């Protein structure tokens, strides 16, 4: 079967994109995969709204042209927030493609720019919607979803299975007691500011975009910023050279999880994450395969405890690594495909299911 994978693909090999990690697992399932980068920018500057509108029109027309040429049995979209409902309908009508979307943000988060009107209006057009939070399923059904599957932020096992070599230079460059890898946000800065002020003896390393733009040189955080966003093997080196990797959950993720929930355990390193139901109970078990915090005081206590108890850290690292192996992209996509085939039959990919929800755990 032919599958058109629509996502953000970077031409810069140093920049990791999640969509790229879907290619090999889908090929292993027997799909002939063709990719389409929906974030191609045809203007040097995107400052003008007219440029944005024209660019979106070009992208939508190019996607339709690519689909008409390739005639995919399945079009698998990863976010694809700029793809218009009319484009989806045209592809369904002219190519008879089965449309799937995995949305890695909240599809209803218009308030912070993580979703668009295209997505909200397009929810009912997709044949199958994949979502990382059980809490969002009722809203998706109300929005007209035909079929919904719970699909966690599975990690790329091919990337995380690769051996990394830590040189002395790497150790000097990445070494820290506590590490955070992620984009600047006010709430994240507040948490890290508390750590700096209450635990000044710790070595804190921050990697991510927008930190230098938002943290003034007078802030206690400024000298903790090591650099911009890091990905792939570079990120794994930062994890390996730190005793504790912190994870903060955005408000839009509610009681769910995020990419770091699995990436850190998959790296065989220690994760200390903001407590959510999914992380502490559903995906891992708090105190055995994951460590969590909810308040500044609890965060300080957990940092001090685990910094001084390497054996306790190692137990959780081993348990979390084993548990994370259930959440590789290869396994989760295979479960999804098997569930679909068992439900509908291998030759019935175009038939539609009305308002049903399937769950992958």
For each feature predicted by the language model, list its residue ranges.
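Nucleotide-sugar donor-binding catalytic core of glycosyltransferases
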Residues: 1-48, 52, 56-66, 70, ...
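A charged, aromatic-enriched C-terminal amphipathic alpha-helix characteristic of glycosyltransferases
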Residues: 29, 308-341
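N-terminal Rossmann-like NAD(P) cofactor-binding module of classical short-chain dehydrogenase/reductase
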Residues: 76
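Charged, glycine-enriched surface loops/patches
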Residues: 90-102, 125
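A short, histidine- and acid-enriched strand-loop-helix "catalytic/donor-clamping" loop
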Residues: 100-113
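Conserved acidic donor-binding segment of nucleotide-sugar-dependent glycosyltransferases
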Residues: 290-296, 305-310
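C-terminal alpha-helical cap of glycosyltransferases
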Residues: 329-361
């Amino acid at each position: 079967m032919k599958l058109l994978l629509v996502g953000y693909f970077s031409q810069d090999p140093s920049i990791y994109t999640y969509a790229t990690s879907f290619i090999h697992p889908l090929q292993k399932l027997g799909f002939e995969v063709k990719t389409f980068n929906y974030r191609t920018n045809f203007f040097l500057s995107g400052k003008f709204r007219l440029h944005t509108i024209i660019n979106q029109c070009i992208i939508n027309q190019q996607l339709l042209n690519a689909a008409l040429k390739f005639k995919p049995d399945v079009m698998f979209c990863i976010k694809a927030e700029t793809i218009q409902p009319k484009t989806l309908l045209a592809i369904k009508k002219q190519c008879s493609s089965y449309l799937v979307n995995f949305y890695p943000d909240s599809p209803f988060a218009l308030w912070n720019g993580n979703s668009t009107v295209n997505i909200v209006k397009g929810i009912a057009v997709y044949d199958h919607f994949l979502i990382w939070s059980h809490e969002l399923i009722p809203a998706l059904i109300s929005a007209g979803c035909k079929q919904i599957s719970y699909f966690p932020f599975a990690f790329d096992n091919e990337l995380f299975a690769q051996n990394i070599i830590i040189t002395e230079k790497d150790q000097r460059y990445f070494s820290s007691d506590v590490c955070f890898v992620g984009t600047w946000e006010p709430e994240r800065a507040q948490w890290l500011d508390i750590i700096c002020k209450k635990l000044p003896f710790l070595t804190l390393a921050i990697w991510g975009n927008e930190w230098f733009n938002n943290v003034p040189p007078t802030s206690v955080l400024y000298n903790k910023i090591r650099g911009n966003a890091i990905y792939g093997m570079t990120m794994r080196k930062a994890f390996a050279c730190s005793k504790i990797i912190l994870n903060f959950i955005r408000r839009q993720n509610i009681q769910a999880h995020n990419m770091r929930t699995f990436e850190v355990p998959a790296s065989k390193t220690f994760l200390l994450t903001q407590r959510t139901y999914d992380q502490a109970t559903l995906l891992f078990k708090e105190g055995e395969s994951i460590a969590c915090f909810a308040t500044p005081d609890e965060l300080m206590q957990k940092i001090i405890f685990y910094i001084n108890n390497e054996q306790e850290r190692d137990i959780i690292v081993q348990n979390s690594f084993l548990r994370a192996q259930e959440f590789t992209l290869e396994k989760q996509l295979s479960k999804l495909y098997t569930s679909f085939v068992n439900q509908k039959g291998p030759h019935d990919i175009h038939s539609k299911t009305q308002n049903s929800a399937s769950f992958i755990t």
